[in-house]
Swiss-Prot record:
SUPFAM superfamilies: Ribosomal protein S16 (SSF54565). One of its GO terms (cellular component) is small ribosomal subunit. One of its GO terms (molecular function) is structural constituent of ribosome. The keyword Endoplasmic reticulum does not apply. Belongs to the bacterial ribosomal protein bS16 family. This is Small ribosomal subunit protein bS16. It comes from the Bacteria. GO terms for biological process: translation.
Length: 90
């Protein structure tokens, strides 16, 4: 099972709102997910990102790969840096 951390759209037409979820890569974008680990609202200025850092790091250490957009959001929040430092043992 290839696990991805990706966005799941739940907003209405012209008003996108996303959940950051852990899902099997074979599931549809808005389909079943394993766990919800955060939210992303691109309409606010500045954009609103809420992420459960512990759950995200746990899934990434277990082999979950973030999508490109989620990787950018995690970098902006400083989670990718923590993940790389933990992986290198710093």
């Amino acid at each position: 099972m290839a696990v991805k951390i990706r966005l799941k759209r739940i907003g209405s037409k012209k008003k996108p709102f996303y959940r950051i979820v852990v899902a099997d890569s074979r599931f549809p974008r808005d389909g079943r997910s394993i766990e919800t680990i955060g939210t992303y609202n691109p309409l606010l200025d500045p954009v609103e990102v809420k992420i459960d850092e512990e759950a995200t790091l746990k899934w990434m250490h277990n082999g979950a790969k973030p999508s490109d957009t989620v990787r950018n959001l995690l970098s902006r929040e400083g989670i990718m840096e923590k993940f790389h430092n933990q992986k290198l043992g710093k």
